[in-house]
């Protein structure tokens, strides 16, 4: 082995393979400026200019790689994949009314 050498595994890596369920959702930015939503944001708490079924999205985040985001341009609908938030499923909140524990 050479110091700093990296050995890669063989085969493909399936993103969010442990997700128990997946949803597809249509989201449209009804605002006048672009909105970006990061990979681990509890989707119902995302920018209020985004129009989608927030009740159905409760407990879900975007199905995208960690540390990335999706940009929603004004007036352009997008279909995005969603996966359940993992871990302890606690959301401290991005708003004044955080949901707290998702599974009560």
From Swiss-Prot:
It comes from the Bacteria. InterPro entries: Urease_beta-like, Urease_betasu_sf, Urease_subunit. Pathway: Nitrogen metabolism; urea degradation; CO(2) and NH(3) from urea (urease route): step 1/1. Its EC number is 3.5.1.5. The keyword Ribosomal protein does not apply. One of its GO terms (biological process) is urea catabolic process. It is found in: Cytoplasm. The keyword Iron-sulfur does not apply. It is an enzyme of class 3 (hydrolase). Keywords: Cytoplasm, Hydrolase. HAMAP family: Urease_beta. Heterotrimer of UreA (gamma), UreB (beta) and UreC (alpha) subunits. Three heterotrimers associate to form the active enzyme. This is Urease subunit beta. The gene is ureB.
């Amino acid at each position: 082995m050479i110091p700093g050498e990296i050995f890669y595994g063989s085969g493909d890596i399936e993103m969010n393979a442990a997700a128990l369920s997946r949803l597809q959702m249509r989201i449209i930015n009804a605002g006048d400026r672009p909105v970006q939503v990061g990979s681990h944001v509890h989707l119902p708490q995302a920018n209020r200019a985004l129009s989608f079924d927030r009740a159905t999205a409760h407990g879900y985040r975007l199905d995208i790689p960690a540390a990335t985001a999706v940009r929603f341009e004004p007036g352009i609908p997008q279909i995005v994949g969603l996966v359940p938030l993992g871990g302890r499923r606690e959301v401290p909140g991005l708003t004044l009314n955080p949901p707290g524990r998702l599974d009560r």
